[in-house]
Structure formats: structure tokens, C-alpha cells
């Protein structure tokens, strides 16, 4: 048998054996958005954004600075560009996913050391990988009228963080992992769960008085404390003076004002069984909805909803409903690099939602809640495991 006939026979056997002959590398090349194309996409998006252009005297003033995504996000098939006049644009590196994933008209993007941002971005990575199984470009979804809601927290200047002075009353780190010796004796970070919740409470300036004390024991698996470690918050005795709990802190505030916010943060953290650490903390959204009602006296309308129970359209309708009633939404998910909690407090009416990450305004902007191609969602529009761990706490009002 000559080589030509042998080659034909081998190909036939592969086909009969069920092997896919289409080379996935070639498929990726067909749908890949290279760096030049990504930059062009960002420029086109900026040119259509009056808010971004307003910060520049002319189009020539606008320069793009590519952000290097490190850690879990390296090689993530996304391009992030900070805009010289303020703001950023996040572009997908594959045409089977939405072209623009997120943007901001001010500030800059930075995910380094910010687990909730990195975790959310990592969910984009996983969804883009899922979209690569398709052989069709992203076509979007049918146009659905969505409300435009300006950032509710921005309207009151609310931008909290996780360090000083917000964490002045969190537990003090007692021991550390190798290489973390500098953290010993420092207060733990407030945690993104407490920060997100406290920002919503500041928006409502409620309650004036706490309702119920809370105590719990830190998990014995926590490597930063000697065990057993019991934490207690005398919430029932608290008088929350919202005039002293400021919308944001620069470090120049009075001690009374600093202690006011740190007391709120500590109470919230303890009320949700915060698993404290030197640079982050974790807790579940089910505990947030319980704490708001039982410990802080919020309306019984407060409840948790899970992304896996809704189609994409119905899920976003739930978020839209809350925002239309001027109620910021507590949002949480879980990814490979940990959990992420943040506040959704606005919408641009084009499937982008305004996110306050709880890092003093860093990386705040408009983001898609997912990057899945509708063709990957299947019947009913569910999101499989990609959004299965996302949840929100809604109905938050006094």
C-alpha cells in the first residue's frame, strides 16, 4: 500500500472512530481577536461614549494603556485598557464572546490583591472558555428595554474600603503562614462581604439602633488565630450615628468618625460569621440576609435569590426591579480564586450593571453579569455551572 492510500485509510478510521477532524487551534484562530483588533474595539467603544470623550479636549488626548493581568488572570483571553483621560475598557479576546465585557468613564482598573475583582474576572475567563466550544460569533440577545439607573452609591459619594480606618475594630492577626510575618499584630481586613453590606446600610442610613447581639466561633481551620476564637458583637446596645458614619474616608477624619465606621464594619462582619484574614475575609450571602433582618432590623422583604433558578433575562429583570426602586443589590459568587461580594447599584440600559467593588472606588464601573454566548446557554437560558454559585440579596430596605 502506498503512502497516499495509507493516509486516506487512516483518516477514514479516525472519522469512523468518532474523532473530530476540525482542528480546535484553527477554530480559535478563526475567532480570535488579536491585540490590534482589541485595541480598535476599545477605541470604537470610546468614540461612541460621550461620557469618556467629555474628559478629553480632543480625540488625540485619549491614549490607551494595556493592563497586565497577573496571577489567575494571566493568559485569560481578555484585554484591559486604562484610558489616559480616566476610565477603562475590557475587551474579550474571542469573537464568540461579547466584544465589550466592562467599562468605566472614570478611574482605572486594578485587580491586584483584590480577590473579589479577580474572582469575578475569573468567571469571565471560564465563560469565554465555554464559548470556545461554539462555531458561531457572539450575536447578542434580543433587545430588551432595560432601565437606566445612575450609580446609587455614587450619588451619595459612598466608597468604602477594607483597611484603615474601616478595620480598626476587627480581630488582630495572631499568627500567619510562612512569608506573612508582617501581618502579625495588625487588624484583619473587614472582608468584602462586610464592606458591601455596610455600603448598602450607609446608603439607607439605617438602622439608628441595633436589634440583636451576635456571637460565633471562628473556624478552627482559620490559620491566622489561636483557637478556639470566639467573637461577640453587642449590636443591641449600638446607637449608629449616621452623621459620624461618613460616605468615605481619607484618613483626616476625627477619631469619633473613624470609630463610628469601624464599629459598624466589625458588627456587620461578626453578624455574618466572617472568616477573617489579613487581606480578605469570607462569608455567605445567606448570612447577610439573616443578619440584616435579625440583627439590624431591616424589612422582612430582604431575601436571597440564586442565579441558577432564573433564565438570564429573568435574572436581570430581578436586578432591574431592585435598582428601579432605588435599592442597591448585594451580589455574591464563588470562583477558583475565592468568593466575591460587591454591590450592584446602577445600570446603563444596555446589559451593563454598575459595580461598586468596595475598594475605595478602584475598578468601579459597568460590567456584564456574565460573558456567555446565548448559544451556550441552551433551552431556557440557564447558565449551567458558570453562574450556579451566584446569588443576590434583594429587597433591602428599612
From Swiss-Prot:
UniProt KW Signal keyword: yes
Key word Ribonucleoprotein present: no
Description of activity control: Synthesized as an inactive zymogen to protect the intracellular components of the bacteria from proteolytic activity during protein production. Once secreted into the extracellular milieu, cleaved into the active protease: maturation can be mediated in cis by autocatalytic cleavage, or in trans by mature SpeB or host proteases. Protease activity is strongly inhibited by zinc and copper, which prevent its maturation into an active protease: inhibition by metal ions may be required to prevent proteolysis of streptococcal proteins.
EC number(s) on file: 3.4.22.10
A single cellular component GO annotation: host extracellular space
Proregion residues excised on maturation: 28-145
Residues annotated as binding a protein: 282, 339
Annotated compartments: Secreted; Host extracellular space; Host cytoplasm
Listed name of the protein: Streptopain
Gene that produces this protein: speB
Amino acid at each position: 500500500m502506498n503512502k497516499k492510500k495509507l493516509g486516506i485509510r487512516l483518516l477514514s478510521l479516525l472519522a469512523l472512530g468518532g474523532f473530530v477532524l476540525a482542528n480546535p487551534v484553527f477554530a480559535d484562530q478563526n475567532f480570535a481577536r488579536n491585540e490590534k483588533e482589541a485595541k480598535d474595539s476599545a477605541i470604537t467603544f470610546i468614540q461612541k461614549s460621550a461620557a469618556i470623550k467629555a474628559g478629553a479636549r480632543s480625540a488625540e488626548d485619549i491614549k490607551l494603556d494595556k493592563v497586565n493581568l497577573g496571577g489567575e488572570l494571566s493568559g485569560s483571553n481578555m484585554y484591559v485598557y486604562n484610558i489616559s483621560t480616566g476610565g477603562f475598557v475590557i475587551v474579550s479576546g474571542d469573537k464568540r464572546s461579547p466584544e465589550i465585557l466592562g467599562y468605566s468613564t472614570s478611574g482605572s482598573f486594578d485587580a491586584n490583591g483584590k480577590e473579589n475583582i479577580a474572582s469575578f474576572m475569573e468567571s469571565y475567563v471560564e465563560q469565554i472558555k465555554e464559548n470556545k466550544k461554539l462555531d458561531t460569533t457572539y450575536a447578542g440577545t434580543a433587545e430588551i428595554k432595560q432601565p437606566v439607573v445612575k450609580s446609587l452609591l455614587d450619588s451619595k459619594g459612598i466608597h468604602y474600603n477594607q483597611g484603615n480606618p474601616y478595620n480598626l475594630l476587627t480581630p488582630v492577626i495572631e499568627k500567619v503562614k510562612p512569608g506573612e510575618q508582617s501581618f502579625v499584630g495588625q487588624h484583619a481586613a473587614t472582608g468584602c462581604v462586610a464592606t458591601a453590606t455596610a455600603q448598602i446600610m450607609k446608603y439607607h442610613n439605617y438602622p439608628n439602633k441595633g436589634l440583636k447581639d451576635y456571637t460565633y466561633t471562628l473556624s478552627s481551620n482559620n490559620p491566622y488565630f489561636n483557637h478556639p476564637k470566639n467573637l461577640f458583637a453587642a449590636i443591641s446596645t449600638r446607637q449608629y450615628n449616621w452623621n459620624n458614619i461618613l460616605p468615605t474616608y481619607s484618613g483626616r477624619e476625627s477619631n469619633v468618625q473613624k470609630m463610628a465606621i469601624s464599629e459598624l464594619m466589625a458588627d456587620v462582619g461578626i453578624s455574618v460569621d466572617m472568616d477573617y484574614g489579613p487581606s480578605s475575609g469570607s462569608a455567605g450571602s445567606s448570612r447577610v440576609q439573616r443578619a440584616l433582618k435579625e440583627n439590624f432590623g431591616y424589612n422582612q422583604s430582604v431575601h436571597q435569590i440564586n442565579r441558577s433558578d432564573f433564565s438570564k433575562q429573568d435574572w436581570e429583570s430581578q436586578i432591574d426591579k431592585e435598582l428601579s426602586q432605588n435599592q442597591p443589590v448585594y451580589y455574591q459568587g464563588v470562583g477558583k480564586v475565592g468568593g466575591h461580594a460587591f454591590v450592584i447599584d446602577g445600570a446603563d440600559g444596555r446589559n451593563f450593571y454598575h459595580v461598586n467593588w468596595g475598594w475605595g472606588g478602584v475598578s468601579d464601573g459597568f460590567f456584564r453579569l456574565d460573558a456567555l454566548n446565548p448559544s451556550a446557554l441552551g433551552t431556557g437560558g440557564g447558565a449551567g455551572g458558570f453562574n450556579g454559585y451566584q446569588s443576590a440579596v434583594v429587597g433591602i430596605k428599612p
